UniProtKB/Swiss-Prot annotation:
It comes from Arabidopsis thaliana. It comes from the Eukaryota. SMART domains: RAB, RAN, RAS, RHO. The lineage of its organism: Eukaryota, Viridiplantae, Streptophyta, Embryophyta, Tracheophyta. This is GTP-binding nuclear protein Ran-2. Its main location: nucleus. Residues 202-221 are annotated as: Disordered. Found in a nuclear export complex with RanGTP, exportin and pre-miRNA. Interacts with RanBP1a and RanBP1b. Interacts with PHRIP1. Interacts with KPNB1. Binds to PHIP1. It is found in: Nucleus; Nucleus envelope. Residues 71-87 are annotated as: Switch-II. GO terms for biological process: protein import into nucleus.
Length: 221
């Protein structure tokens, strides 16, 4: 399906909407993919930048047309035109800012009101920053809504490909799909050392084993 400002390509392509509070790192994340950044198009009627991100899988090439809001979410909600025809989504929050996580349910509701039954990934960004406010055990929304959750660090490229691989597998209906080469990414601006990565993964595993609280707000008392 060709959407405004999207050239048609002869391989599978999908509209990916990225939502979340302003300042959570959505634009930084999308811009890591260098060819997508080079080929982005501005869609003035809706006020978004559309980045075509190509990935190479064992089943051939796949493209995500990533819709980036260009910061307009800071002035209230996004128009329905941003969501219409969305085929998959990423909801992003900032692990150093609690309010951005508390607003995740609102973004999820707005998304699901327009796009029913699409695969959604929740991403906690900025795990490279030391003063983390939202701990792994406090992130429970994805478990209640059956979403996939990844912790990422856009500036260090940590886990950059994981949300895209999850969505590609869901959209292709093939859990064995995998990327056969990495896209060209911008050089890391910060480095997340191996010990920090291992600690993150251990914290996530421990959090997944905990029973769910009755209410998300309990975790922040």
């Amino acid at each position: 399906m060709a959407l405004p400002n999207q050239q048609t390509v002869d391989y599978p392509s999908f509209k990916l909407v990225i939502v979340g509070d302003g300042g959570t790192g959505k634009t930084t994340f999308v811009k890591r993919h260098l060819t997508g950044e080079f080929e982005k198009k501005y869609e003035p009627t809706i006020g978004v930048e559309v980045h075509p991100l190509d990935f190479f899988t064992n089943c051939g090439k796949i493209r995500f047309y990533c819709w980036d809001t260009a910061g307009q979410e800071k002035f209230g909600g996004l128009r329905d035109g941003y969501y219409i025809h969305g085929q998959c989504a990423i909801i992003m929050f900032d692990v150093t800012a609690r309010l951005t996580y508390k607003n995740v349910p609102t973004w999820h509701r707005d998304l699901c009101r327009v796009c029913e039954n699409i695969p959604i990934v929740l991403c906690g960004n900025k795990v490279d920053v030391k003063n983390r406010q939202v701990k792994a055990k406090q992130v429970t929304f994805h478990r209640k809504k059956n979403l996939q959750y990844y912790e990422i660090s856009a500036k260090s490229n940590y886990n950059f490909e994981k949300p895209f691989l999850y969505l590609a597998r869901k959209l292709a209906g093939d859990q064995n799909l995998h990327f056969v080469e990495s896209p060209a990414l911008a050089p890391p601006e910060v480095h997340l050392d191996i010990a920090a990565q291992q600690q993150n993964e251990a914290d996530l595993a421990a959090a997944a084993a905990q029973p769910l609280p009755d209410d998300d707000d309990d975790a922040f008392e």
